[in-house]
Amino acid sequence: NNHFKPNRTNFDWLSRDADQVDKYINDPLCGFPCSAETWQQLLSGLIEISKKDQLDKIPHTLPMYLFGGDKDPVGRMGKGIPALEQKLRQTGHDNVTHKLYKEARHEMLNETCKDDVYQDVANWIEQQL
């Protein structure tokens, strides 16, 4: 949340849309503390699926559309999506496209630019058909 000071809430990193952040805060199934084991399992899984032998299991001709916000701290402030695209290309996946949305944060489908995101995804799908 340090990137978004002054902060209105501890969850401002999720979206620029204050209503969406408030919905997250008020949802009893969101924002709860995770156990150390949960984090260990999550991170171990992410490490495992990013290995070359795992990426090679994805069909190399499968079209992929990666998108995110350039202010998403989980996506390394816009660096994660292009890095993933590069890694996929290095493993022989040649039909990979990405788009970063300026100033957008973590929850792209709950962002202030969500209409653009939905339209861009729909356009990409149509191009694949």
What are these regions (language model features)?
Residues 70-73, 104-105:
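Acidic beta-to-alpha connecting loop that harbors the catalytic carboxylate
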Residues 1-29:
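Alpha/beta-hydrolase-fold enzymes
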Residues 35-56:
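Active-site nucleophile elbow and catalytic-triad environment of alpha/beta-hydrolase enzymes
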Residues 66-68:
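Short beta-strand/loop motif that positions the catalytic acidic residue
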Residues 91, 95-129:
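Catalytic active-site module of serine/aspartate enzymes centered on a nucleophile-bearing elbow/loop
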Residues 58-64, 91-94:
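Short, proline-enriched alpha-helix->beta-strand connector loops that line the catalytic pocket
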Residues 73-83:
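Conserved alpha/beta-hydrolase "acid-adjacent" motif
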